[in-house]
Amino acid sequence: MLKQRTIKQIVKTVGIGLHSGRKVELTLRPAAPDTGIVFSRVDLATPVDIPASAMAIGDTRMASVLQKDGARVSTIEHLMSACAGLGIDNLYIDVTAEEIPIMDGSAGSFVFLIQSAGIEEQNAAKKFIKVTKPVEIRDGDKFARLDPYFGFKLKFTIDFRHPAVDKTGQALEVDFANTSYVREIARARTFGFAHEVEMMRELGLARGGSMDNAIVLDEYRILNNDGLRYDDEFVKHKMLDAIGDLYVIGHPLLAAYDAYKSGHGLNNALLRELLAHEDSYEIVTFDDTQKAPRGFAYETQTAFA
């Protein structure tokens, strides 16, 4: 049986919020089978638990934001991406602010945190959402689409008119049957343009943003002294985001995802469109791990690692 997973022990870290610039404490705790990924605002007088779900995403302008009873947890996508890549089904995430810390701007720190806690299989079947009919969302020239596929593969195309991005490639296709999330995707950092960062700071945003947690570009080049971690780091980061955005549906998808200039809003709209059509998906489990898609059928190894 392909089993659900959680972590073996509690782990903690401290970072800063990308937009607030304030210190945030993050604690990951093991969770029982069928709990899902649950964020908890432990800094509030009465802590609020917010289970990750497509319907709980309330704001997608700068990040994916979970909302419930007036409480918010923002910038969840990198941590959710790490959970997807490592096959974590059940986890409590305690946070002392309304923002998950940005760490180094990628999912790499969260992968390290989860791996250092250890991954434990649980005595319950891992549930997948198997897409059975195509689903698509369009917004002008942008689109995001899910097609039936026995596995999980993604194709993402960006369109940033910038010399540095043009040089590194605007499109990427990855099938996790033969690609390592940890090696090939997890370390891709978020990126932004210097003039946009200044504008955001004037609005009280991006106070924690720096070259320690983002790739920063001027009109012509990358300003970071250490350059890029991957030749195609820009599009890889957008794929990292998409993996995290899609994982808020509550289970790993068995599907082919294709997107052009998609972002947090379009990704969430795609999930809602899928859930609105009950004939376009089904929940499946695998009693025989050998019959599960490659990339998920590891007994003790991480999901796409």
From Swiss-Prot:
Known pathway: Glycolipid biosynthesis; lipid IV(A) biosynthesis; lipid IV(A) from (3R)-3-hydroxytetradecanoyl-[acyl-carrier-protein] and UDP-N-acetyl-alpha-D-glucosamine: step 2/6
UniProt protein name: UDP-3-O-acyl-N-acetylglucosamine deacetylase
Keyword field contains Translocase: no
Source organism per UniProt: Paraburkholderia phytofirmans (strain DSM 17436 / LMG 22146 / PsJN)
GO cellular component, one term: membrane
Cofactor(s) listed in the protein's UniProt record: Zn(2+)
UniProt family annotation: Belongs to the LpxC family.
Catalytic activity from the UniProt record: a UDP-3-O-[(3R)-3-hydroxyacyl]-N-acetyl-alpha-D-glucosamine + H2O = a UDP-3-O-[(3R)-3-hydroxyacyl]-alpha-D-glucosamine + acetate
Coiled coil ranges: none
Alphabetized UniProt keyword annotations: Hydrolase, Lipid A biosynthesis, Lipid biosynthesis, Lipid metabolism, Metal-binding, Zinc
EC number(s) recorded for this UniProt protein: 3.5.1.108
A molecular function GO annotation: UDP-3-O-acyl-N-acetylglucosamine deacetylase activity
GO BP annotations listed: lipid A biosynthetic process
Function field: Catalyzes the hydrolysis of UDP-3-O-myristoyl-N-acetylglucosamine to form UDP-3-O-myristoylglucosamine and acetate, the committed step in lipid A biosynthesis.
Binding sites annotated in the UniProt record for Zn(2+): H78, H237, D241
Active site per UniProt: H264
